[in-house]
Amino acid sequence: MADQLIRATAAEDGIRAVGVITTRLTEEARQRHKLSYVATAALGRTMAAGLLLASSMKQPQARVNIRIKGDGPLEGLFVDAGCDGTVRGYVYNPAIELPPNAKGKLDVGGAVGSQGYLYVIRDLGYGYPYSSTVELVSGEIAEDITHYLVTSEQTPSALVLGVFVTEAGVTAAGGVLIQVLPKAAQDEALVEKLESRISALSGFTPLLQRGLSLSEIFEQLLGDMGLTILPQRQLVRFHCRCSFDRMLGALKILGSDELQDMIDRDNGAEATCHFCGEVYQASSEQLAELIDELKAEAGG
């Protein structure tokens, strides 16, 4: 099943729902960063969450940044997701592995840690970005981002995220975000029914492994609540905006002395993109050209 995002409404537009499948892009991130099982789950959950949050933004260039800094051995992670369906990200300590938790599942909460902060930045592409910071609740990602949505955006929300990874790689990943808007929030019976449905879920990835599509998952959750699945399906993918030219621009900022030192010491330069793991190499000749450009710009 292709990585994709779909949107839906229910309860006469009083409920907003978004679902995303991110199996392939999570596997690409795992391979690019050489992630452990638990690091794959942590980053995969957060990339799915980033795409779900970004989906509510209207501007084509709008993006959501999620940064988590916890006291666990993973140390932290960063995700950049756009409403155009692109996402990238990295973890600070990609190789750490932990024993399964008490439920026999990957111990994402233990890896991230329960003490720390979740930072969310919404950037419309113009003006000042909107940023918010909340304390971590559990380090399990979904609970922490739900806490952010309820406290910072004052929107009752339920977020279910999952990543299933084996020795063969990621076989299922994605999530569902359901939000109760003000017009439906006063209907206690509706809210209780929705909470009961979500609590009864065994997780997101088991549904994908059973072969259910996002539409079928929505039917299971909201089918008797006036569900309307919007026709537009958006493809999502791992995509990094790094390039060789951007790398040269970053090197140029270092200045002539540092560039000359790289030429003398290393006969060139090598840089690795944090977001995607792509390695770029600049020759001594290319560094010399940057030095010439700096001299010309300085008028000498």
UniProtKB/Swiss-Prot annotation:
Q: Which residues form a coiled coil?
A: none
Q: Where in the cell is it found?
A: Cytoplasm
**Any Pfam family the entry gives:** HSP33
Q: Which InterPro entries match?
A: Heat_shock_Hsp33, Heat_shock_Hsp33_C, Heat_shock_Hsp33_N
Q: Name one GO molecular function term.
A: protein folding chaperone
Q: Can you name a GO cellular component term?
A: cytoplasm
Under the heading HAMAP family, the entry gives: HslO
Family per UniProt?
Answer: Belongs to the HSP33 family.
Q: Which PANTHER family match?
A: 33 KDA CHAPERONIN
What functional role does this protein have? Redox regulated molecular chaperone. Protects both thermally unfolding and oxidatively damaged proteins from irreversible aggregation. Plays an important role in the bacterial defense system toward oxidative stress.
Output this protein's name. Answer: 33 kDa chaperonin
* Gene behind the chain: hslO
